[in-house]
Amino acid sequence: MPQQIELRNIALQAAQPLVHGVSLTLQRGRVLALVGGSGSGKSLTCAATLGILPAGVRQTAGEILADGKPVSPCALRGIKIATIMQNPRSAFNPLHTMHTHARETCLALGKPADDATLTAAIEAVGLENAARVLKLYPFEMSGGMLQRMMIAMAVLCESPFIIADEPTTDLDVVAQARILDLLESIMQKQAPGMLLVTHDMGVVARLADDVAVMSHGKIVEQGDVETLFNVPKHAVTRSLVSAHLALYGMELAS
C-alpha cells in the first residue's frame, strides 16, 4: 500500500476555470487540513482525487501520483482511499439496511464480510446495540448516527488514506465532538493519511498536522498547523485564524 499520495498541478474547468494548479501531498500518519470558504474549490479537489467530478466539470491539467508513480483516481477509490462524505444521508441507498451497505462494501473490496467483522466496526465507532443498527434503514437514523456509520465503513475498508469532507457539518455540538473523537482515534490506531476538508479552524487546531488554504480555486498558503496559526501570511488565512481566535476573545498578533 502507498505511503504517499500527491496531487500535482490539478486544474478543473466547467464553463469557466474552477480549480487552478492545485498541488497537495498526503502522507501516512499525518492529517492535512484543506480549508477555505464555500466555493473555494475544496470539495471539487476531493472529487478529482477520487475520479467523481460532477457532470460538466472536467480535469484539464495535472496528475495524481502514489509513491511517485502516476495512478488513476479510480484505482484509488475505496481500496486506497476511503471517504467520509459531507452529507452522509446521500451516501446510503434508502432501500438497503446498514447490514447490506456494510457487507457489500466489504465484498467489493475483498474484505471479510462476516457479522462479527461488521459488528466490531460498528462498536468501534460507538454505536450501541450493533445488531439493531445493522437492521436499520438510513431514514431511521439521525445525521450523527449516519456519519458514524460512514466512519465505520471507512474502518472496514482498512484503506491507507481517508478523505473526510466536512465531516462535522450540520451536526449538533455533541455529535460533532463524537465525530472528532472517532477521527482522532482512527489516526492513533491505524495511522492513515487523512485529507480533512473543513471551514472550521477549531477542527483544524485539534486534528491537523499540516494545513493548505484555498481561495478562488487556488492554494494560497500551506504549512504546518503551528506556523499557520501563529504566523499566517495570506489575507485569507489571517481572516480565518482571526475569526477563530475571536471566538475565545483573542486577537491575532499584528
UniProtKB/Swiss-Prot annotation:
It is a peripheral membrane protein. Residues 2-241 form the ABC transporter domain. SUPFAM superfamilies: P-loop containing nucleoside triphosphate hydrolases. GO terms for molecular function: ABC-type nickel transporter activity; ATP binding; ATP hydrolysis activity; nickel cation binding. One of its GO terms (cellular component) is plasma membrane. SMART domains: AAA. It is found in: Cell inner membrane. ATP binds at residues 36-43. It comes from the Bacteria. InterPro entries: AAA+_ATPase (IPR003593), ABC_Ni/Peptide_Import (IPR050388), ABC_transporter-like_ATP-bd (IPR003439), ABC_transporter-like_CS (IPR017871), Nickel_NikD (IPR014138), P-loop_NTPase (IPR027417). It catalyses: Ni(2+)(out) + ATP + H2O = Ni(2+)(in) + ADP + phosphate + H(+). Its EC number is 7.2.2.11. Keywords: ATP-binding, Cell inner membrane, Cell membrane, Ion transport, Membrane, Nickel, Nickel transport, Nucleotide-binding, Translocase, Transport. Belongs to the ABC transporter superfamily. Nickel importer (TC 3.A.1.5.3) family. The complex is composed of two ATP-binding proteins (NikD and NikE), two transmembrane proteins (NikB and NikC) and a solute-binding protein (NikA). This is Nickel import ATP-binding protein NikD. It comes from Escherichia coli O6:H1 (strain CFT073 / ATCC 700928 / UPEC).
